[in-house]
Each structure stands twice: as C-alpha cells, then as structure tokens.
Amino acid sequence: MKDEIFKEPIKKQFEFDKSVASVFDDMISRSVPFYKESSNLICKLLSRILKENAKCVDLGCSTAELLLNLHQKRGDLNLFGVDNSPSMLEIAAAKATAYGAKINFSCEDILECDFKGADCVILNYTLQFIRPIKRAEFMRKICENLSDNGVFIFSEKLVYSDKTLSKEMIEIYEDYKENQGYSKYEIAEKRKALENVLIPYTEDENKTLALNSGFKSVEAIFKWANFAVFMARK
C-alpha cells in the first residue's frame, strides 16, 4: 500500500501502529534515501563475515524486510526478529511464510528482551527512537550480550554540529522526499509527528556512544547527507 498517512492533519505523535505497519515498506523506501541499497550492503557484508549458523538478531525488525534479504543470501543463519508492534510482526510473519524463511519473531520491548549469545545485532533506524537517557545503557547491554568478536550494525538519521550545514542537509532531504512524491504538507505533518519522538545524534556522538559501551571499533560504512549506517565490533 502507498503511504498517505500524513495527507490529513495529525492527531497524535508518531507511533508504529496498524496504519503505519500497513504502509511501512512504502514509507521507509520513500523516506530513507538509498534504503534498499544500504540494506543490501548490510546483508552482503554480513553474509561474508558471519560464521556458519550464526545467530543474528534484528531489534525493531518491523516487517522483516532486512531479515528476509539476509535469509536469501545466507540460508544457514539463525534469524530472530524482535518488535513491540503486533501489526508489524503480523506482516513480517506472513512475508516469512511466503518466502519459506524460518525466522523466529518475538513481540516485546527491545530494551527488555534477551538476545544473549548473538553473533550479530541489528538496529535499523531504531536507536533514534529510544530516549537518549536510555541509549548508553542499552548499547552497553548489546555489547555485553554479543558473542566474542560479535558485530553490531546500526543505521541512524543524523544531525550536524554545524547548525548551518544541518539546516542545508534537512532542506536537501526534504527536496528528496518531494521527489519521492510527498507533498510539502505531508512532509511538514510528519516532521511535527516525529518531534520529541525521533531524536538523532551526530555521527561523532553515535561513534562515541558505541566506543564508550565497550566496542573496540566503529566505522560508518554508508552515508548520505543526514543518514548513516555504522558497524561496531566487540
């Protein structure tokens, strides 16, 4: 289905409810620049570096698009998807069945779930929705629960320390969304809905957060304007 949620005035803050879940794949593909390409890069990289039968956990898996891509590249992997939206997981489970992919789904709060012994943890545009006061503790939990030499992949929307540059990047991004078919009104309504819900960090803040959480290295492996994908190693 096509994302037309913000064609009407918003009545509440943004949340991943049934209405969002039904259009999520269209929404994210049109809202995140090079989403398909960056997701494919993540899956290609993981398919090369993960050991046989590795345990891979996607926290905030939404409709499982990335996990399905990973399954197609490495059918031996043990895949787990966690999300707190039943509507998202209903779609994810249906897609997994259609593709014949064995993926273990769990509907729970990613801050509370158990993923000990994972060889890879993925947070694809998820960390930015966690309250800043809880992010450091959560990232420490990820590092502690990863296996030795485990990999942490996280994708995030960014802000820039240079406020003028940040403003320019936001305007470039909004031009991108217009080119994807969103009206100025829809863009403005979604921006209002996400205020105080999506709270981005700078690239350096994200890297520092990972290093302070115990990861031995962290690199940006993909970046476009105010979007980036990071890989950290335990």
Residues covered by each model-derived region:
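N-terminal, positively charged/glycine-rich alpha-helical extensions of SAM-dependent methyltransferases
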Residues: 1-23
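Conserved alpha-helix/loop element of class I SAM-dependent methyltransferases that forms part
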Residues: 34-52
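Class I SAM-dependent methyltransferase SAM/SAH-binding core
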Residues: 57, 64-111
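A conserved beta-strand element that flanks and buttresses the S-adenosyl-L-methionine
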Residues: 122
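A short glycine-rich, Lys/Arg-flanked "PGG" loop and its adjoining helix->strand segment in the class I
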Residues: 136-148
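Conserved beta-strand signature within the Rossmann-like core of class I S-adenosyl-L-methionine
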Residues: 149-157
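C-terminal alpha-helical "lid/dimerization" subdomain adjacent to the S-adenosyl-L-methionine
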Residues: 158-209
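Core SAM-dependent methyltransferase catalytic element
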Residues: 216-234
